[in-house]
């Protein structure tokens, strides 16, 4: 169930002593201990939440959902990522310890989905913010597809060399855009613009001569109506 082929972990002597490397040992220890950070922003997360149930039981893969990025090594971005959420997503990724992995789940996360054509506030692909290891297309992907993506990620982890991954991440390091706020003149002075207010004339303020003059000029038929 959790068997992954190791190209370098096959040197077994006659005395049943396994000869391997530190990279292979580290990769093997992380295969069944991927702790995902739940980052759901849309309907794709509902499909991922069904994996927690007894039907799919993703605990057999060693997946333990975490609510803190400092305790997670995998983040599943499920749903639409907006411009306002982009700095928060990058900050969560930076707070995760190395080595860390990203699975982009759903069409909205990969390309923007239905919001990619005429939306002014949607990120066209989460890979513009953080590096993605596995792309999982669908709208939304089925739970079986999520399990397949996790299996592919575990195969990638088993063949990984830590030094190479660290070097590649340094070359494609993401960055956080700082928001700049400019303090302008306050428009809340406490005084209302009287020119914008509509003041309807009251009957008490209307002179009696004008009122009776207007009443005498109106026909009885108009008064009835």
Swiss-Prot record:
Catalytic reactions of this protein: a plastoquinone + NADH + (n+1) H(+)(in) = a plastoquinol + NAD(+) + n H(+)(out); a plastoquinone + NADPH + (n+1) H(+)(in) = a plastoquinol + NADP(+) + n H(+)(out)
Keyword field contains Kinase: no
UniProt key word Thylakoid: yes
Cofactor(s) it depends on: [4Fe-4S] cluster
Pfam families tied to this protein: Oxidored_q6
Enzyme Commission number(s) of this protein: 7.1.1.-
Transmembrane segment boundaries: none
GO biological process, one term: aerobic respiration
Subunit structure and binding partners: NDH is composed of at least 16 different subunits, 5 of which are encoded in the nucleus.
Family as reported in the entry's similarity comment: Belongs to the complex I 20 kDa subunit family.
NCBIfam families, A to Z: nuoB_fam, PRK06411.1
Purpose: NDH shuttles electrons from NAD(P)H:plastoquinone, via FMN and iron-sulfur (Fe-S) centers, to quinones in the photosynthetic chain and possibly in a chloroplast respiratory chain. The immediate electron acceptor for the enzyme in this species is believed to be plastoquinone. Couples the redox reaction to proton translocation, and thus conserves the redox energy in a proton gradient.
Protein name: NAD(P)H-quinone oxidoreductase subunit K, chloroplastic
Source species of the chain: Nandina domestica
Gene (UniProt): ndhK
């Amino acid at each position: 169930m959790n068997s992954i082929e190791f190209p370098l972990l096959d040197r077994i002597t006659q005395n049943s002593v396994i000869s391997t490397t530190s990279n292979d040992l580290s990769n093997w220890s992380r295969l069944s201990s991927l702790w995902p950070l739940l980052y759901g922003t849309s309907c794709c997360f509902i499909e991922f939440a069904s994996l927690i149930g007894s039907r799919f039981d993703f605990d057999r893969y060693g997946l333990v959902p975490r609510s803190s990025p400092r305790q997670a090594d995998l983040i599943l971005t499920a749903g639409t990522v907006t411009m306002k959420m982009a700095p928060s997503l990058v900050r969560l990724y930076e707070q995760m310890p190395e080595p860390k992995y990203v699975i982009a789940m759903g069409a909205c996360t990969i390309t923007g989905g239905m919001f990619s054509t005429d939306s002014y506030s949607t990120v066209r692909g989460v890979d513009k913010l953080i590096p993605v290891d596995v792309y999982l297309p669908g709208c939304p992907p089925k739970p079986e597809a999520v399990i397949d993506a996790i299996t592919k990620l575990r195969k990638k982890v088993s063949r990984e060399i830590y030094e190479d991954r660290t070097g590649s991440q340094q070359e494609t390091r993401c960055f956080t855009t700082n928001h700049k706020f400019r303090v302008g003149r306050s428009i809340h002075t406490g005084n209302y613009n009287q020119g914008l207010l509509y003041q309807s004339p009251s009957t008490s303020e209307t002179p009696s001569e004008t009122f009776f003059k207007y009443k005498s000029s109106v026909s009885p038929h108009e008064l009835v109506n």
